[in-house]
Amino acid sequence: MNILLIGDIVGTQGCDFLRSVLPGFKKFKAIDVVIANGENAAPGNGITSSAAEHIFSSGVDFITTGNHAFRRSEVYHFLDERSDIIRPANVGAACPGKGFGVIDMGRVRIGVINLLGRAYINGSDNPFSCIDSLMEEISDCRIKIVDIHAEATAEKLAMGFYLDGKATAVAHPCSDCRRKSPARRHGLYNRPRHDGT
């Protein structure tokens, strides 16, 4: 089974590009399932129901989000109604929607968990405190994908090591990571650089 994970779809231009490229790419690469991050799909940022419909009509099967999703008040109304759009599980039980979902392909069920890192992102609980119970929720799924939306590479690597042998994939298909220096690429953000910055 071929599963495609797509990082942040940004704005109307990103949605339009997706619609023009994804159908042909799915056919060319024999993609069975597409999971995309839609937290910045609305103009500016956030996600709206119209942006979500644009993404789905392009050929995406499932949408994950991140911290920017909640910048649009509309999201609070449709997250509870959609099982194919999930929010980070560790943003609090009071938030609408769920932090996990299942894609039922008939013979194969794919469990998807959405988490949010804590470094440089406000408002999230420790993702390690909830991941075991979330993995239990999707234990009947043959394929288990964890999308950890995080800034620090160290958080993503730590989650990957923790879920080694438990999850099929731990991914972070996001483009907002800091990439200025090798230290920053490896999650060592708070170490001072020699040039004083």
Task: Identify the meaning behind each predicted range.
Residues 1-197:
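Acidic, metal/ion-coordinating pockets
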